[in-house]
Swiss-Prot record:
Required to facilitate the formation of correct disulfide bonds in some periplasmic proteins and for the assembly of the periplasmic c-type cytochromes. Acts by transferring electrons from cytoplasmic thioredoxin to the periplasm. This transfer involves a cascade of disulfide bond formation and reduction steps. The lineage of its organism: Bacteria, Pseudomonadati, Pseudomonadota, Gammaproteobacteria, Enterobacterales. This is Thiol:disulfide interchange protein DsbD. It comes from Yersinia pestis. It is a multi-pass membrane protein. Its EC number is 1.8.1.8. Disulfide bonds join C134-C140, C209-C331, C507-C510. The chain crosses the membrane at residues 200-222, 234-256, 271-293, 314-336, 356-378, 391-408, 412-431, 438-455. InterPro entries: Cyt_c_assmbl_TM_dom, DsbD_gamma, DsbDN, DsbDN_sf, Thiol_diS_interchange_DbsD, Thioredoxin-like_fold, Thioredoxin-like_sf, Thioredoxin_CS. It catalyses: [protein]-dithiol + NAD(+) = [protein]-disulfide + NADH + H(+); [protein]-dithiol + NADP(+) = [protein]-disulfide + NADPH + H(+). PANTHER family: THIOL:DISULFIDE INTERCHANGE PROTEIN DSBD (PTHR32234:SF0). Its main location: membrane. Residues 166-186 are annotated as: Disordered. The gene is dsbD. One of its GO terms (biological process) is cytochrome complex assembly.
């Protein structure tokens, strides 16, 4: 017994006193051990985000079981139907997660369930579901796309604003899914509620091209007959407004119906960018850079038709209102065009007709007041009307930001909103300098405070952007686009070891590698004799999938090392984030990669 105990003590001492090389021999190479441990701690994407679906009649149920220590990005979930139309749905609120590079984002942990109504589905209809997530330990998976076949669902009625789906057409439902490249579902309503449409119409009535015309229009409505009672005056004014509203409503329905036929095309990023440019041009006209209106010959003819109607009669007043809806002044052309373009892009007939009706109703309310009470309740004309017109220019500028947010993502969307808000508050502050009342000083302080607050995203972008640029300016990667190009570069490496960094914009840890690891002087000196390659797989296309599959890459960041013969040194592979000290030690423990 004593002999066994002494033998055990001697064996333990020999292990503790063994040199470093002996330890490596006992446990295997240190880099290899670390790599195996790193590989084993990350699970395949199907296990990290177990996805399931089932259809119950006209409802599609989607569910994700999220493994502990992993999370899904809310903004990276998109639903795109093929030969089907989906009803309105919204993603549940996620958990706020602060990201150094993307700011405040929302994520899902543990479980996510979506219930999506199907308004119609043709034969061989399907829905593609795309999602993307990461591990908390610093590892991100490429976006996953699953195609779900749908059972046939017959639309309840075509009058509800949803067109029938034929067997060859691809219809993206309005206000339910993203265009290609977008990150989050499109809201189920227009960005402006019906109340906003009404308020915009009222505001347009106080522009310099509209308000001075109301007394004249009021006189035309009443005609030259004997004085009317207040009740009769109210009826005539309301009938005129309803005639004008009818024209706008029909215009909204026609444009929305046309947009519905081209819904898929109107969701394309290039189309969204084109619409955004048009909105910017329309907004510039509100700032007085140029004037938009119907040709003068057409306006003259419409005015003659309107004047030929007999004032004071219900039919004549209604006809005058309908024709007035077609006569656009320079102050109303740009807002009306912006609303029509957005309605066409949304493709929602109910929202299109309703929005234009409320817009016309808003423009008509001041006219009813003028007709009933004269000019007593209407403010005097002055420079303030031009300021109202310019303010609506900023309202129109909000529409391109809303559309570009779908193409550029939430991060750039936040920066654009910040830029627009800075411009608006700056404009308002400059206008306030023209006033000298005491209370205006308080408004100026509030405007300055608001200006500083809304400028924060731009400040973060500027300073972080400069920091990142300075951090990575000394690292020099040679880009490779696909597997054949990589193989060609490896064949021409001239006996040098090669490091391949697999990078993507959606990989947060990849950006951390750039900022904190590759920027380190010691790391750069260690890699001085290594050929540095980088493959940007952000698009996650077929070529990228082939490259990742070739090397059995689960996700990013992943860094591969190749010897002088072009063979991967599997023991040196890095999976997941390493800071500069850890990565430097990894390189030093694997001399073959930096010799």
């Amino acid at each position: 017994m004593a002999q066994r105990f002494i033998t055990l003590i001697l064996l333990l001492c020999s292990v503790l006193l063994a040199p470093h090389s002996a330890q490596s021999s006992l446990f295997g190479e240190n880099a290899s051990f670390g790599t195996k441990n790193s590989q084993s701690r990350f699970i395949p994407v199907d296990q990290a985000f177990a996805f399931d679906f089932h259809q119950q009649g006209d409802q599609l149920n989607l569910s994700w079981q999220i493994h502990p220590g992993y999370y899904l990005y809310r903004q990276q979930i998109k639903i795109v139907p093929q030969q089907a139309a989906l009803g309105a749905f919204t993603l549940p609120e996620g958990i706020t997660h602060h990201d150094e590079f993307y700011g405040e984002v929302e994520i899902f942990k543990q479980q996510l369930t979506l219930k999506i109504p199907i308004t119609q589905a043709a034969e061989q209809a399907s829905v593609s579901v795309t999602y993307q997530g990461c591990a908390e330990a610093g590892f991100c998976y490429p976006p996953e796309t699953r195609v779900i076949p749908l059972d046939v669902v017959v639309a309840a009625s075509t009058a509800s604003g949803t067109a029938a789906v034929n067997s060859s057409a691809t219809v993206n439902p309005p206000a339910t899914t993203q265009p290609e490249g977008d990150a989050t579902p499109v809201p189920s309503t227009l960005p402006f509620s019906p109340l906003w449409a009404l308020l915009i119409g009222i505001g347009i009535a106080f522009t310099p091209c509209v308000l001075p015309m109301y007394p004249l229009i009021s006189a035309v409505i009443l005609g030259r007959e004997k004085p009317h009672s207040q009740r009769r005056i109210l009826i005539l004014a309301v009938v005129y407004v309803q005639g004008m509203a009818l024209t706008y409503t029909l215009l909204g329905l026609v444009v929305a119906a046309a947009g519905l036929q081209f819904q898929a095309a109107l969701q394309h990023p290039y189309v969204l960018i084109g619409l955004s440019v048009l909105f910017v041009l329309l907004a510039l006209s509100m700032f007085g850079l140029y004037s938009l209106q119907l040709p003068s010959s057409l306006q003259t003819r419409l005015t003659q038709w309107s004047n030929s109607q007999r004032g004071g009669s219900l039919a004549g007043v209604f006809a005058m209102g309908a024709l007035a809806g077609l006569i656009c002044s320079p102050c109303t052309t740009a807002p009306l065009s912006a609303i029509l373009l957005y309605i066409a892009q949304s493709g929602n007939m109910l929202a299109g007709g309703g929005t234009l009706y409320l817009y016309a109703l808003g423009m008509g309310i001041p006219l009813v007041v003028v007709t009933l009470f004269g000019n007593k309740l209407i403010p005097r004309s002055g420079p303030w009307m031009q300021y109202v017109k310019e303010a609506f220019g900023f309202v129109i500028l909000a529409l391109p930001v809303f559309l570009l947010e779908r193409v550029l993502g939430d991060v750039w969307g936040l920066r654009l909103w910040s830029l627009l808000a800075v411009a608006f508050f700056g404009w308002a502050f400059v206008l306030s300098l023209k006033a000298h009342a005491g209370w205006v000083r308080v408004c100026q302080l509030l405007l300055l405070a608001a200006l500083l607050i809304v400028a924060r995203p731009l400040q973060d972008w500027a300073f972080n952007g400069n920091t990142q640029q300075n951090a990575v300016k000394h690292i020099n990667f040679q880009p490779v686009a696909n597997l054949p190009q990589l193989q060609a570069v490896l064949a021409q490496a001239q006996g040098k070891p090669v490091m391949l960094d697999l990078y993507a914009d959606w990989c947060v840890a990849c950006k951390e590698f750039e900022k904190y690891t590759f920027s380190d002087d010691k790391v750069q000196r260690q890699l001085a004799n290594t050929l540095l390659l980088q493959a940007d797989v952000t698009a996650n296309n077929a070529e990228h999938a082939t490259l990742l599959k070739k090397f059995n890459v689960l996700g990013l960041p992943t860094i591969l090392f190749f010897d002088s013969q072009g063979n991967e040194i599997t023991a040196a592979r890095v999976t997941g984030f390493m800071d500069a000290a850890q990565f430097l030690q990894h390189l030093q423990n694997t001399p073959a990669v930096t010799k």
